[in-house]
């Protein structure tokens, strides 16, 4: 056997061993939670991944620089969606803000800038004067925003987000859920990168059981 082939076989063997160790290391109840009952998903033919977050959560803010490149590398069979977790009226207000910006078509564009404004500039979304001034600086029509935030569509999405928070038994943020079957927190992942590695593992588990998602 020539040296090149031998090295290739050794590398493949180590890769297989590493993958087996990784799968073995991810233990249900320790590194992630198995949901019982499973929650309904809204991603026909795809694997649904949800991120539960709150704009005021420093851990969610710290996840963003790691999450952004991860999202760019998502496989086409994965559908990712952000869900503002809701535990109290303050969180519900930020959920309304999130869904209003989304409805106006600027949600993705302003997601990171809003995080920055909150955690770097101490902006509060419940300070109407300060927040409206921030919206104006971003080129958002404040009058239109004030109409949208009171709309039936936004109120419905807030109720749905609250139901998802309860249904997925989310007790802190950030947390991620995979296809209605699993949830994982930063504590379970050990770090932001660890969280995403476990999500990758759970996506792989789900993919094996969903032929249509391959």
Question: Which sequence ranges carry the predicted segments?
Answer:
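Conserved strand-to-helix beginnings and helix N-cap segments that scaffold or border functional pockets
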Residues: 61-64, 91-95, 189-192
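Structural microenvironment flanking redox-active thiols in thiol-disulfide oxidoreductases
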Residues: 73-104, 108-136
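Solvent-exposed loop/turn segments at secondary-structure junctions
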Residues: 55-59, 86-90, 116-121, 151-154, ...
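C-terminal cap of thioredoxin/glutaredoxin-like
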Residues: 137-214
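Extracytoplasmic/secreted envelope proteins and their assembly/folding machinery
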Residues: 64-71, 94-98, 111, 128, ...
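Residues at secondary-structure transition points
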Residues: 44-47, 92, 126, 190
